[in-house]
Design a protein with these regions (language model features):
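Residue-level detector of functionally pivotal "anchor" positions at catalytic/ligand-binding pockets or at interdomain
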Residues: 386-405, 411, 418-420, 433
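Short coil/turn motif common to extracellular beta-sandwich-like domains
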Residues: 216-218, 407-414
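Sec-dependent signal peptide recognition
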Residues: 2-11
Length: 473
């Protein structure tokens, strides 16, 4: 579907192109949305760059202030978002060597670790406490330390529990994991690597708490191995002797790009970057059941509502936050993933031209700020900060005005008003089928018989304004 694009919005050269625009009637500041408000936007021109890529976040432990670490083609930008409606661009750490499309950032304690595919870049180390007192921003920062154990890298992963970084896609270990001890951040030390499963494009490393008792407390590396079209699961507890556990493949593979564990480490959600364009189906998220790490199995394939390519995705609680290129940020409810139920519950689309299977739009999102603000890094659109409409002040009254109970429910669902009159109610299932709808109610309480509904997730919309998720037992 062709989307309306307000090109006039791009002529702003000030830092704040727009600020706090609620999502009303599917639009916020000229961007299509569902359930997510636009808090702020900074175009790429402000950062003096032509492209953005990866991103991460840091929260200052001293005062709780939140900062965005934004990857650019020519360096890394730092943005203070402690006032989300008025973010402050503090400055940039220039690239260590040349410019490149690819840059990746992670944090450990109060330090940022930055890699790039620029030749000879190595790993930049930056003390984030420099962001506390910046006079006359934006300024140009300098790195505090440098690691030259590899020339360049596609990505970096950090297990903050152990103090180890894992650079992947380097010129070492066949492009597999390159281990670095960063427990003393300004004095990183090479600690070995793993090459048996080939080049890794991206990875996640966790201290394992999942259902496989054989690996309880172990440090588990799960690599998405790009053109190798496999997932590689490795026990990296002993850095001098990492042990391959298993590999797995799947049908219609093109480029095994990136994935993330559910918080209980049972499931792994994977995105393949080429499958949408190669095969022609809608955005596919592949779910693997890793109950037994030695014998992982494909559990479920979820297909989105557009043909856009998926890029990076992250799990936080019951939600999966997906950077979906031309389709923007998509938020999926995975609370019922065990029963093969995944449903999109919201989105914010920063790319206006289309939802095609192209590489335009959102490269990365960062959903882990305690404030619940979500950073979106758009390749050409720049920095966006969004927030769930249910969390913003303008919606608090709606959230508190209506109560939906019991939840979970068995046979009957009650919607009760604590103020506003209930004028309309609709209930839809996870595929959008309307199972109940009434309008012109003008009542303060409504009981609905749901005994015929199948067990699963449903969405109750009240007055075409507030939507609440309910579970039918």
């Amino acid at each position: 579907m062709k989307k309306n694009f307000l090109s006039v919005l791009l002529i702003f050269t000030t830092v704040f192109a727009f600020a706090q625009t609620p999502c009303n009637n599917g639009e916020a500041g000229g961007y299509e949305c569902n359930g997510y408000d636009l808090m702020a936007h900074i175009p790429l021109s402000v950062f003096n760059t032509t492209g953005a890529n990866d991103s991460w976040g840091w929260t200052d432990p001293d005062d709780g202030k939140e900062y965005v670490l934004m990857g650019l083609e020519n360096g890394t930008a730092f943005i203070d978002i402690s006032d989300p409606v008025n973010p402050i661009y503090l400055g940039k750490l220039p690239t260590a060597t040349g410019t490149t499309v690819w840059r990746d950032i992670k944090t450990y304690n109060n330090y940022a670790f930055i890699v790039s595919e620029a030749s000879g870049h190595g790993m930049q180390i930056f003390d984030l406490t420099h962001l506390r007192n910046v006079n006359n921003p934006p300024v140009t920062f300098t790195e505090d330390a440098h690691y030259s154990g590899f020339s360049d890298a596609h990505n970096i992963v950090i297990n903050e529990n152990t103090g180890y970084a894992y650079a992947v896609g380097t010129n070492t270990f066949g492009g597999g994991a390159h281990f670095v001890n960063i427990q003393d951040p300004l004095n990183p030390v090479a600690a070995g690597g793993f090459s048996a499963d080939g080049n890794t494009h991206d990875a996640q490393v966790v201290t394992y708490i999942g259902p496989d008792a054989d690996y309880a407390g172990s440090e588990i590396y799960i690599g998405s191995n790009g053109s190798g079209q496999i997932i590689s699961i490795v026990d990296v507890t002993n850095k001098s002797n990492p042990q391959g556990i298993s590999t797995l493949s799947y049908s219609n593979s093109g480029y095994t790009h990136q994935g993330w564990f559910t918080e209980d480490h049972r499931f792994f959600l994977l995105g393949d970057e080429f499958d949408e364009s190669n095969v022609g189906f809608n955005t596919r998220t592949i779910v693997f059941d890793l109950t037994d790490l030695d014998n992982p199995v494909l559990s479920y394939e979820y297909f989105g509502v557009t043909p856009a390519i998926d890029h990076n995705g992250y799990v936080k609680g019951d939600n999966y936050y997906l950077s979906n290129y031309a389709a923007g940020l998509r938020v999926l409810d995975i609370s019922d993933i065990e029963n093969d139920n995944i449903v999109e519950i919201g989105f914010f689309d920063t790319y206006q031209d289309n939802n095609d299977a192209s590489y335009n739009g959102v490269w990365n999102v960062y959903p882990y700020f305690e404030s619940e603000n979500i950073m979106i890094n758009d390749r050409s659109g720049g920095f966006f900060l969004v927030r769930s409409s249910l969390l913003n002040n303008n919606d608090f009254s709606a959230v508190n005005t209506f109560v939906v109970y019991p939840n979970p429910a068995s046979d009957e669902l009650t919607i009760k008003s604590n103020g506003d009159v209930i004028s309309s109610i609709s209930i839809v299932d996870v595929v959008g089928k309307v199972l109940f709808a009434e309008s012109d109610l003008n009542s303060e309480i409504k009981n609905i018989d749901i005994s015929s509904f199948s067990a699963g997730i449903y969405f109750v919309n009240i007055n075409n304004n507030l939507t609440k998720k309910v579970i039918k037992k």
